[in-house]
Curated annotation (Swiss-Prot):
GO cellular component: ATP-binding cassette (ABC) transporter complex; ATP-binding cassette (ABC) transporter complex, substrate-binding subunit-containing; membrane; plasma membrane
Subcellular location: Cell inner membrane
Topology with respect to the bilayer: Multi-pass membrane protein
Family under the similarity heading: Belongs to the binding-protein-dependent transport system permease family. AraH/RbsC subfamily.
Gene Ontology molecular function: transmembrane transporter activity
This protein's name: Probable ABC transporter permease protein YphD
Record-linked InterPro entries: ABC_transp_permease
Signal peptide: none
């Protein structure tokens, strides 16, 4: 199980070799991020500018907020491919509620509840009816995408000017509000994963669900809760996306689920479950965001960008696997 931060443990004498071995994945990702900054700074006009760095933070928030819950889902040995359509559907529902003059606070509360309920539905299908999580969330992906496009005729639903939404889509002390929310939620999920019985149960279920059940862990409840959290954070992302775009859009967040899953896996979380790190996911989010931003500034064809991004992601995952295997051998 990877640690969630890099500082040396207090009260323990740890050699540099042991420290590097323990955090080889995070160190590797930091090196990758440094290389990306160097390459794009030299070749992509405007990449290092303050304005572009704020854009990087905004894009990172769109991926990162959903990635915190996805980390727990993958650690538990599950997967959720419904994130993108859920984010878009929430933004559409929020826009319609505001058009019907529902107060913003009530509208936000309703779409947060909607996101949690949709996540719970996926969790119940997995935890109660034992439907594979990929199948359950793939069905949800199709239903939400189709419903959103049907409700809007594939057109954006405009949102009238609103001071609170403008603030959510803007900056606070020069930093995007969405990025600040991402950081707060990151700290919360680090606490949940490391300091609570629920967090430890997630790792146990991912390591061996049968053994976890025999140890008294309610596997069904754990599975339902992690999908509920995923739906809730997807709703948060949907609200922030609507605030940023000034509209609800069923076509927004297209492919977001793949960026989120890629960020988690690149960050070192094992798809087989039982091992993962939120700090690694944070670095994975930065890697995926920097790649996307840099390729746009380089003027690479949008279709070819997907090819380049896919190759880089596969290489990063392979590097993560090799580094982890090398670390495991070193510990022996």
């Amino acid at each position: 199980m990877s640690a969630s931060s890099l500082p040396l443990p207090q009260g323990k004498s740890v050699s540099l070799k042991q420290f590097v071995s323990r955090h080889i994945n995070e160190i590797g990702l930091l090196v990758v991020i440094a290389i990306l900054y160097l390459v794009f700074s030299l070749n992509a006009p405007g990449f290092i500018s303050l304005n572009n760095q704020m854009n990087v933070l905004r894009d990172a928030a769109t991926i990162g907020i959903a990635a915190w819950a996805m980390t727990l889902i993958i650690i538990s040995g599950e997967i959720d491919v419904s994130v993108g359509p859920m984010v878009a559907f929430v933004s559409v529902c929020l826009a319609f509620l505001l058009q019907f003059e529902v107060p913003l606070a009530v509208a936000c509360l309703l779409v947060l509840l909607l996101g949690a309920l949709m996540g719970t539905l996926a969790g119940v299908l997995r935890g109660v009816f034992n439907v594979p999580s990929f199948v359950a969330t793939l069905g949800l992906w199709s239903a939400l995408r189709g419903m959103g496009l049907f409700m809007t005729n594939a057109l954006p639903v405009p949102i009238d000017e609103n001071e609170v939404l403008d603030w959510l889509g803007g900056q606070f002390l020069g930093v995007p509000v969405s990025a600040l929310i991402m950081i707060v939620l990151f700290a919360l999920f680090v606490f949940i994963s490391r300091k609570t019985a629920f967090g430890r149960s997630v790792f146990a279920v991912g390591g061996n669900a049968t053994a976890a059940q025999l140890c008294g862990i309610n596997v069904r409840r754990v599975r339902i809760l992690i999908f509920t959290l995923s739906g809730l954070l997807a709703a948060v992302t949907g609200i922030l996306l609507a605030a940023r775009l000034g509209s609800g859009n069923a076509g927004a967040a297209n492919g977001l689920e793949f960026d989120v899953i890629a960020a988690v896996v690149v960050g070192g979380t094992a798809l087989s479950g039982g091992r993962g790190s939120l700090f690694g996911t944070l670095l994975g989010v930065l890697v995926i965001t920097l790649i996307g931003n840099g390729l746009v500034l380089l003027g690479i064809n949008s279709f070819f960008q997907q090819v380049v991004r896919g190759v880089i992601i596969v290489v990063a995952v392979l590097a993560n696997i090799l580094l982890t295997q090398r670390s495991s051998k070193a510990k022996r």
